[in-house]
């Protein structure tokens, strides 16, 4: 039976809401603040999956006993340059520093996700290589002033209009860079929300 199953996205990110909606699976949103500091003893891949699980668990623990068969999805995205993870910028100067380092070369974007259901956790991640062309200091400053990318890992949103002129290559899932590897997440959720065979 799937009628009582309810999918909950452990995020208030408008980008992740839009991406999860692409799966066609109805869902609600909820989020709880957690410490998203990376564990230096873990790889970046394990960190994004671990934080995704922590986000999902934090929401799962807040659900009432009569919440039905809840399925909670948590996700975490980071940008990796030369093996170092770049989180969200603290201010405009930090954002400028990040974008100055990213411009004119390629970097990795990793998104981990965790699906909690019936006491079990499904965790995975996706990796995308993004190449950003050369940007002048003025172009970087304008982007920061207009788009205010302070809630984005690496200080940029690949979907932002002012960045489109500088994205010179993508190897992997585009949606992963936006914040959720839609195809991988859908493949993991599909067995939990099977469609009628005649649809």
Swiss-Prot record:
InterPro entries: ITPase-like_fam (IPR029001), Maf-like (IPR003697). SUPFAM superfamilies: ITPase-like. HAMAP family: Maf. The active site is at 76 (proton acceptor). Keywords: Cytoplasm, Hydrolase, Nucleotide metabolism. GO terms for cellular component: cytoplasm. Belongs to the Maf family. YhdE subfamily. Pfam families: Maf (PF02545). The record marks 15, 77, 159 as: Important for substrate specificity. Nucleoside triphosphate pyrophosphatase that hydrolyzes dTTP and UTP. May have a dual role in cell division arrest and in preventing the incorporation of modified nucleotides into cellular nucleic acids. The keyword Hydrolase applies. One of its GO terms (biological process) is nucleotide metabolic process. Its main location: cytoplasm. Its EC number is 3.6.1.9. Its cofactor is a divalent metal cation. It is found in: Cytoplasm. One of its GO terms (molecular function) is UTP diphosphatase activity. This is dTTP/UTP pyrophosphatase. It catalyses: dTTP + H2O = dTMP + diphosphate + H(+); UTP + H2O = UMP + diphosphate + H(+). It comes from the Bacteria.
């Amino acid at each position: 039976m799937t009628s009582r199953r309810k999918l909950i996205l452990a995020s208030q990110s408008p980008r992740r809401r839009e991406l999860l909606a692409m799966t066609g699976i109805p869902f609600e949103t909820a989020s709880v603040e957690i410490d998203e500091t990376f564990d230096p003893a873990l790889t970046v891949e394990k960190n994004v999956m671990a934080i995704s699980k922590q986000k999902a668990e934090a929401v799962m623990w807040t659900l009432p006993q009569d919440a039905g068969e809840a399925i909670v999805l948590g996700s975490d995205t980071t940008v990796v340059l030369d093996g170092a993870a770049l989180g969200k910028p603290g201010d405009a100067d930090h954002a400028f520093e990040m974008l100055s380092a990213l411009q004119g070369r390629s970097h990795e974007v990793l998104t981990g996700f965790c699906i909690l259901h019936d006491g079990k956790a499904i965790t995975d991640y996706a990796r995308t290589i993004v190449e950003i062309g050369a940007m002048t200091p003025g172009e970087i400053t304008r982007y920061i002033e207009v788009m205010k990318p302070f809630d984005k890992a690496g200080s940029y949103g690949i979907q932002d209009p002012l960045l489109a002129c500088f994205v010179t290559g993508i190897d992997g899932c585009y949606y992963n860079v936006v914040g959720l590897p839609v195809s991988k997440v859908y493949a993991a959720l599909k067995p939990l929300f099977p469609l009628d065979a005649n649809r």
